[in-house]
């Protein structure tokens, strides 16, 4: 597989059926052994599943212009455990917090953000906040939306 992406590809695991429901024939690549438990059908009705997390992320991308068109600003660029960034457009700011660590990581909101005033749009774990921050769970992601009020004239 050297020089190709074949080593990173496996058939989509649609169900717990033979060959993960991918084909009734012989798949080009072997199906992952975890397909009876990890498959689309098993995650379909679980609101906390990875499948539904990504569906919600895609919905936000389609519905919120700030996700698509907002200017980008990164926070904590030297961190090798957190990827934190802002998207800003008009009166909206989106704060995205992603942990790339298998271990818990302390997170403190950047200056100008009060997590309690933001609307938590997407989360992969809990929504616990303490002292304008939280301790991430392994590989946790959160997305907050902040809207500013129009200034009085």
Can you say where each PLM-predicted feature lies in the sequence?
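Structural signature of nuclease core domains in nucleic-acid processing machines
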Residues: 95-100, 127
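Surface-exposed beta-strand/loop patches in extracellular or lumenal glycoproteins
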Residues: 98-114
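Solvent-exposed beta-hairpin/edge-strand motifs
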Residues: 110-125
């Amino acid at each position: 597989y050297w020089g190709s992406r074949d080593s990173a590809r496996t058939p989509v695991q649609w169900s717990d059926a033979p060959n993960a429901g991918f084909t009734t024939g012989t798949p080009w690549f072997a199906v992952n052994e975890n397909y009876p438990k990890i498959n689309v059908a098993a995650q379909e009705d679980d609101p906390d599943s990875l499948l539904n997390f990504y569906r919600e992320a895609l919905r936000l991308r389609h519905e919120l212009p700030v996700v698509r068109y907002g200017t980008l600003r990164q926070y904590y660029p030297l961190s090798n455990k957190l990827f934190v960034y802002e998207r800003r457009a008009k009166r909206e700011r989106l704060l995205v917090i992603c942990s790339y660590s298998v271990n818990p990581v302390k997170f403190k909101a950047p200056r100008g953000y009060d997590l309690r005033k933001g609307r938590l749009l997407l989360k992969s774990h809990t929504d616990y906040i303490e002292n304008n921050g939280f301790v991430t769970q392994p590989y946790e992601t959160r997305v907050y939306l902040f809207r500013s009020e129009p200034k009085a004239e």
